[in-house]
Design a protein with these regions (language model features):
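Sec-dependent N-terminal signal peptides of Gram-positive bacterial secreted proteins and lipoproteins
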Residues: 2-29
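N-terminal, intrinsically disordered, polar/charged segments of Gram-positive cell-envelope systems
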Residues: 23-68
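Short leucine-rich amphipathic alpha-helices used at interfaces
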Residues: 42-44, 49, 80-81, 86-88, ...
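Second-shell residues forming the walls of enzyme active-site clefts
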Residues: 62, 100-112, 207-305
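Loop/turn elements at helix/coil->beta-strand transitions in domains of secreted/extracellular proteins
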Residues: 66-69, 87-92, 118-122, 171-176, ...
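Short, hydrophobic beta-strand segments that form beta-sheet elements in well-ordered domains
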Residues: 70-75, 124
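Short, acidic/polar
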Residues: 74-86, 158-169, 251-258
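Enzymes and membrane/adaptor proteins characterized by extended Gly/Ser/Thr/Asp/Glu-rich
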Residues: 86-205, 232-244, 273-283
């Protein structure tokens, strides 16, 4: 009798242990699932609350205020505060002249005054590509290096570290949007845009763009992809009328990939370039501006807000 009881006790112990493990594992999974569901509900509630705030603000806005919010204006040389109140701009863009002779403390005080003068919080942006295009870091002892130099020295890790430093600096002076990264491709080192690119192929540039915009978003700084749909090896469109004879298929195979990577990663701003594309049929019956917006919407997964 004792011999029969002993195996039964062993089996019972075995099933209790295994059953306990299964029950414990099940409870753990339920806790994890419950936490995930709670997080998702919190996120949905947060988004709903944000949308509600925006909708309430829109209802209370005048037509003039709504129109003004469409403009991201360069800071005028005079009457900066008055213009914010008169035209209800959505934001101000800070360029080289705005930083001349200023300290970081001066810039923070300046952006604080801009925000205080605006009824609606401003989007304050500035170029800080690094290298040949620096704004705020130009008043520092050591300006930021170009993405080309950084990538050659330290790869993507150097890019990530640099982006974090830029985000911290911009936020410290009240700048909440960066007019970078440059998403252009250029194969010719003598091309106008080459020194401002990462100097790599489409796939590597796409990875670079994704890293930068994601890092900026983590640090709560906006980003801008430029110059859509890609400068290529063309000349300087600031000083001349440039014609790009590439087809839509050619652009899709390479130049558009970095822009798509940025769109897939975060909500993004596009910076368009003024170059004529005779091989794109969509330009025949539209103004240049409408054509570029139509092209951006239909050649990428971009949603126009």
């Amino acid at each position: 009798m004792r011999r029969r009881i002993k195996p039964i006790v062993v089996y019972l112990f075995f099933f209790l242990v295994i059953g306990g493990l299964i029950l414990s594992d099940h409870q753990h999974h339920r806790q994890v699932e419950s936490q995930v569901e709670k997080t998702e509900k919190t996120t949905q509630t947060s988004e709903t609350e944000k949308n509600k705030v925006v909708e309430e603000r829109l209802v209370s806005m005048t037509l003039e205020e709504k129109v003004g919010q469409l403009f991201w204006a360069r800071v005028p040389s005079s009457h900066q505060l008055e213009d914010l109140q008169s035209y209800h701009f959505g934001g101000y863009l800070l360029f080289g002249r705005d930083f001349q002779g200023q300290t970081l403390e001066d810039m923070k005080a300046l952006t604080d005054r801009y925000q205080a003068a605006s009824k609606i919080p401003l989007l304050i942006g500035s170029d800080e590509e690094g290298g040949t295009v620096t704004r705020i870091s130009s008043i520092l002892e050591t300006p930021f290096q170009s993405p080309l130099e950084l990538y050659q020295k330290g790869g993507m890790e150097a890019i990530r570290s640099d982006t974090r430093q830029k985000a911290e600096l911009l936020k410290s002076v009240g700048i909440n949007a960066g007019l970078f990264p440059v998403a252009d491709l250029a194969s010719n080192p003598s091309a106008f845009i080459y020194d401002r690119t990462i100097g790599q192929d489409a796939q590597t540039t796409a990875s670079y763009v994704e890293e930068v915009v994601t890092e900026l978003q983590k640090n709560k700084v906006g980003s801008t992809l430029k110059h859509f749909p890609g400068y290529g090896d063309n000349g300087d469109s600031h000083t001349d009328i440039i014609q790009d004879n590439r087809s839509l298929d050619e652009l899709r195979q390479a130049d558009l990939l970095p822009f798509q990577a940025g769109i897939d990663a975060v909500r993004i701003v596009f910076w368009f370039r003024t170059i004529f594309y005779p091989r794109l049929i969509l330009f025949r019956h539209r103004s240049h501006q409408k054509s570029m917006i139509f092209f951006a919407k239909n050649s990428t997964s971009m949603e126009l807000l």
